[in-house]
Amino acid sequence: MHAIVEQLKSTVAATAATDIRGAFASDPKRFERFSSRFDDLLMDYSKCAVNDEIMALLETLCTQAGVAEKREAMFNGEAINFTEGRAVLHTALRNRANTPVVVDGKNVMPDVNAVLHAMSAFAEGLRQGTITGSTGLQITDVVNIGIGGSDLGPAMATLALAPFHDGPRLHFVSNVDGAHIADTLKLLEPETTLFIVASKTFTTIETMTNAATARAFIASALGEDAVGDHFAAVSTALEKVAAFGIGSDRVFGFWDWVGGRYSIWSAIGLPLMIAVGADNFVEFLAGAHAMDMHFRTAPFRENLPMLLGAIGYHHRNVLDYPTRAILPYDQRLSRFPAYLQQLDMESNGKGVTIDGSPVKGNSGPVVWGEPGTNGQHAFYQLIHQGTSVIPAEFMIAAKGFEPELRHQHDLLIANCLAQSAALMKGRTLDEAKGQLLKSGMDQAKADHIAPHRVFTGNRPSITFVYEQLTPFALGRLIALYEHRVFVEGVLFGINSFDQWGVELGKELATGLLPVVQGKAGTDGQDASTAGLVAALSDLGR
């Protein structure tokens, strides 16, 4: 693989591939040749530093890395997360074909379908008012208490599908900072509130701390006996859940082969189902399943996850671009960049390959972003004129959900396409001078000001266009990015499905808590940590 990476670098230089503006000038059919479509989902990668030679090399790279073979190993339930000895089967959760998926000799689909059925019955009971609070009043507000994958996915998707909400209001509490749950509880009435505690082990410190506060909120207002009517759990720790006061009929489980950042398709998606209904949740699963089948069957130049992953690797390891910006032109996708940040950086933020040796070159990029057009008035300046090249990934729907505001959606589309074009085209010094002179500026001043109005252009971007952000379309989009992360992980040569980097800070925080509380001294702490503890204590701890 190293030889192909070096060949890619030399090909980029020899073919002037980074002159994207020039490539469009010389090839009027570039868009047709470097875009691909899956149903209504269009991926335009023509504004990236690629050509036919580079795409052929990237395809060879994927072949040599064994992407297709490792993809099938994942779908077939092999323990590709070898550091934890686990299969990776979030795809089974959305297997709408219901074909057998075998793990350790057992078809998991009956269990998957049983949990989905139980979720549906509970969600519809809440939505229809047959499942009520302890006083008999209908539940109007549902609070999901979780963190990481137990929060980011359902929070993102629930906001994204706001036009489909016809159930209780949804709230999400994740941060152990007491302000988060305190601000949420101020909005709620105990009699009409249900809390979902999402923690596989029922030991996650942030989640269980917030859950205890929520429990006290219910118990103090309605009594201890009311707790069970105002809580549900997504967990496998049945004894701990029972000790908390939640009945087994309100516990929804999932499996070790579902990683947290891939768990929106599982019972972790219960808040989304409550908001949009079981039928729309199944449509969400169906969209992801459609992308799964596309990923498994489409040839490389038509395979959106393969293309996105290969180009992402090209940006990171051939062109050495350190970050990527996720720029959805949809306010309801405002949490999508944060969701992808966890999905990508927790998966591919690794420094060791599968064989235990250091990664050669780079692993995953920094992933960040905000919705357009907000970002245009914040950080796009750096993307356009900064010294680092930042690949951008735009997404825009052809239709919104507010027909009476069609003119605003037209403006949104125009801005999205304009930003993509501006990053590619830029503005030369001569063009900048000409514009200033045309405005009436004298030559000397124009010569002085023009360099500040130069845009180098040739800034790469990918644009996704789709009809409308329906449950099906959202499921398809999330699955596309999941598989992109998988492809890049294979090319990096790493295990994308563990997250040992999350654990060290947890371990240290557990040891530091008694120090912060003044129950233990700072002996054994480094000087900086000891000094910070002392400073906080002096400020009134």
Curated annotation (Swiss-Prot):
Homology family: Belongs to the GPI family.
Pathway: Carbohydrate biosynthesis; gluconeogenesis; Carbohydrate degradation; glycolysis; D-glyceraldehyde 3-phosphate and glycerone phosphate from D-glucose: step 2/4
Domain of life: Bacteria
Catalytic residues as annotated in Swiss-Prot or TrEMBL: 346 (proton donor), 377, 506
Main location: cytoplasm
Job of this protein: Catalyzes the reversible isomerization of glucose-6-phosphate to fructose-6-phosphate.
Keyword line: Cytoplasm, Gluconeogenesis, Glycolysis, Isomerase
Full protein name: Glucose-6-phosphate isomerase
InterPro entries listed in its UniProt record: G6P_Isomerase (IPR001672), G6P_Isomerase_C (IPR023096), Phosphoglucose_isomerase_CS (IPR018189), SIS_dom_sf (IPR046348), SIS_PGI_1 (IPR035476), SIS_PGI_2 (IPR035482)
GO MF annotation: an example: monosaccharide binding
Disulfides per UniProt: none
Entry's EC annotation: 5.3.1.9
Stretch forming the signal peptide: none
Compartments (UniProt record): Cytoplasm
UniProt organism field: Allorhizobium ampelinum (strain ATCC BAA-846 / DSM 112012 / S4) (Agrobacterium vitis (strain S4))
A GO cellular component entry from the record: cytosol
Keyword set includes Lipid biosynthesis: no
Enzyme class, UniProt record, top EC level: isomerase
Reaction(s) the record says it catalyses: alpha-D-glucose 6-phosphate = beta-D-fructose 6-phosphate
